[in-house]
């Protein structure tokens, strides 16, 4: 490669040539030779292509039994290279990114935004049990450790990230908020004041949205709550129940509703089973996707799972919903594949899901891009 004519080209010309390639091809070229890898990982080149549209991928969270180390027969830990499985819906392909550049044991990816993946990582020092919340870009292999948190937050908190990488860790009783700008390199702590455990919270448009069950032990009654993150000098969050008379019984017809971010910053998705009756434990006829316009506060039906596809979920006692934006994904026990709803192309199956013996996987949207750490 040293004698190749490409070495005679000035760096500006090479940057111009490679910046015209799709991100997929740039990643392939990085593995061709050491010269290409140095060129395509340089800060100058990354700054040039950081404004390029991202790859819209699905990243899978590791199974609960998955660890990046295992014990060998002699009782010693054997390291396994940590990685994250991702799916490219445009190419209908599974592949994975190595996370071996992170100085942490057992990294557990939990969220993503603006090209960064957020994960919990165990301290390398086996004598400590503390976990750190880390932001990283597996394409550039850069990372940043957020201010230290107690391990209880990783066990009980839900990590939320918005489009400008503001981070919240939310529990029923308290919330932590980090922007890196309001108070430099510190978490702000608030009391949550929620009536019950928040389900599938979403952080978007400087607001948090969550579902809470305010019903009785024998009958669920779901309500939608929101909280604006406008005054960060107070010590508690003011949650407001969003409801309109025109909504009617919309929360009564959905079984086990869950929220996801919609397309843009003004749409919220609610997904759940469509009840066939109003009895205490009704059967469901299919899975329904509803879309709420946050400006007009009007609901509309966005999608309804085809009956032949729903039969596989009907036979499963449990299923998961994840994704967001233009695509929603569904997994179920013993299914062996994912169902995907695309708001433009409808419903289809995704085969070849890796790493899940029981089929019940979880994941999140990963908009992969070559960008520098903020």
From Swiss-Prot:
The F-box is necessary for the interaction with ASK proteins. Pathway: Protein modification; protein ubiquitination. Component of SCF(ASK-cullin-F-box) E3 ubiquitin ligase complexes, which may mediate the ubiquitination and subsequent proteasomal degradation of target proteins. It is found in: Nucleus. One of its GO terms (cellular component) is nucleus. SMART domains: FBOX (SM00256). Part of a SCF (ASK-cullin-F-box) protein ligase complex. Interacts with SKP1A/ASK1, SKP1B/ASK2, ASK11 and ASK13. SUPFAM superfamilies: F-box domain (SSF81383), Kelch motif (SSF117281). Keywords: Nucleus, Ubl conjugation pathway. The keyword Kinase does not apply. The keyword Iron does not apply. Pfam families: F-box, Kelch_2. This is SKP1-interacting partner 15. Residues 3-48 form the F-box domain.
């Amino acid at each position: 490669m040293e004698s190749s004519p490409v070495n005679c080209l000035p760096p500006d010309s090479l940057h111009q040539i490679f910046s015209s390639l799709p991100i997929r091809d740039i990643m392939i070229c990085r593995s061709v030779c050491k010269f290409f890898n140095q060129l395509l990982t340089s800060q100058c080149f990354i700054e040039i292509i950081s404004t390029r549209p991202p790859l819209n991928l699905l990243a899978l969270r590791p199974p609960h039994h998955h660890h990046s180390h295992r014990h060998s027969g002699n009782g010693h830990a054997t390291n396994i290279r940590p990685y994250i499985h991702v799916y490219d819906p445009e190419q209908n392909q599974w592949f994975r990114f190595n996370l071996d550049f992170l100085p942490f044991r057992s990294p557990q990816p939990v969220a993503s935004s603006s090209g960064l993946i957020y994960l919990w990582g165990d301290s390398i020092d086996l004598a400590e049990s503390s976990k750190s919340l880390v932001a990283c870009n597996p394409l550039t292999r850069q990372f940043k450790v957020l201010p230290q948190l107690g391990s209880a937050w990783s066990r009980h908190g839900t990590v939320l990230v918005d489009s400008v990488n503001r981070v919240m860790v939310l529990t029923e009783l308290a919330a932590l908020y980090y922007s890196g700008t309001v108070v430099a390199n510190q978490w702000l702590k608030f009391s949550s004041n929620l009536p019950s455990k928040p389900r599938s919270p979403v952080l978007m448009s400087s607001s948090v949205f969550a579902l809470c069950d305010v019903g009785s032990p024998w009958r669920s009654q779901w309500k939608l709550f929101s909280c604006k993150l406008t005054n960060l000098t107070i010590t508690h969050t003011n949650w407001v129940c969003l409801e309109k008379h025109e909504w009617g019984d919309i929360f009564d017809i959905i079984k086990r509703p869950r929220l996801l971010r919609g397309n843009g910053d003004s749409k919220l998705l609610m997904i759940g089973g469509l009840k066939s009756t109003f009895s205490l434990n009704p059967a469901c006829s299919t899975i329904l996707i509803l879309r709420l316009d946050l400006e007009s506060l009007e609901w509309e039906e966005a999608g309804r799972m085809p009956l032949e596809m729903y039969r596989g979920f009907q036979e499963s006692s449990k299923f998961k919903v994840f994704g967001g934006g233009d695509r929603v994904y569904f997994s179920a026990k013993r299914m062996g594949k994912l169902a995907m709803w695309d708001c433009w192309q409808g419903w289809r199956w995704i085969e070849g899901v890796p790493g899940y013996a029981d089929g019940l996987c979880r994941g999140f949207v990963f908009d992969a891009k070559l960008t520098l750490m903020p």
